[in-house]
Amino acid sequence: MFDPNGAGSETVDDEQATLDLLTHGTLEIEGRLVDASNATLYCTITTGRPESGPEMSPVMHRAKDSKNPKKAKRQQASIACVYKPIAGERPLWDFPAGTLAGREVAAYAVSRAAGWDVVPPTVMRDGPFGPGMCQLWIDHDTGVDLIALSRRTDHPGLRDMAVFDAVVNNADRKIGHLLPVPDGHLYGCDHGVCFAEDYKLRTVLWQWRGKTLPRRSVEALRRLKGELAEGSLGAGLSGLLTSSEIETTRIRVDTLLKHRVHPYPPTDWPAVPWPPI
């Protein structure tokens, strides 16, 4: 099973197994994240019975041996996840109704295709309140100062996220959307307001504005360009975004590759989300 606390050591097969569980497992609602703008439900998703070991909590991240998630996953057949039903989406003036879940899944697809891995495994599936997005729950490292992290200029994963946000045109990158895990890898969450056709980039990660893109970012953008043109990504996005949204994503990738600099803040749109936390 895919281990979010040690993403670098896992394989494509591990991640695919997690995607399969998210898609086909039995979803049980445990609670609600009450501060979220849209209906955001904390769930467990289960298949079969624990493979071995004593009876334990069904949530992988609450395993008895919480410092060894690989051991925990061998003992259990459940993971924690977030389920956001389309029916619980709050209407927005600048995004079509009922499209936020699809945008979250599209953000994961783009992150995975480029090799950034900044979005946890995410799928579209049916659930107790109808279709919606289902995303692996990430237990972030609570010892990390998120405000200090958001201001760093020497964190490769944070810079990857800034480039990713430019590609998907993220209109809501807040500090609280940063999910660092103990091994140093960085995830992000809440990508429902991405992929607008108009330039809506709104983020707390402007520290590289106008700076030359690092080589790793250029290589990731080239991979993404290829996947959009000739790979399965373009076809996969067609069920989640409009053709115009996909085309403007291609244009953003091409523009970044042409100029090879981080974008500047918009002049006709708030550059930082509110509240920024």
What are the language-model segments listed below?
Residues 1-277:
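Phosphate/dinucleotide-binding and metal-coordinating scaffold of catalytic cores
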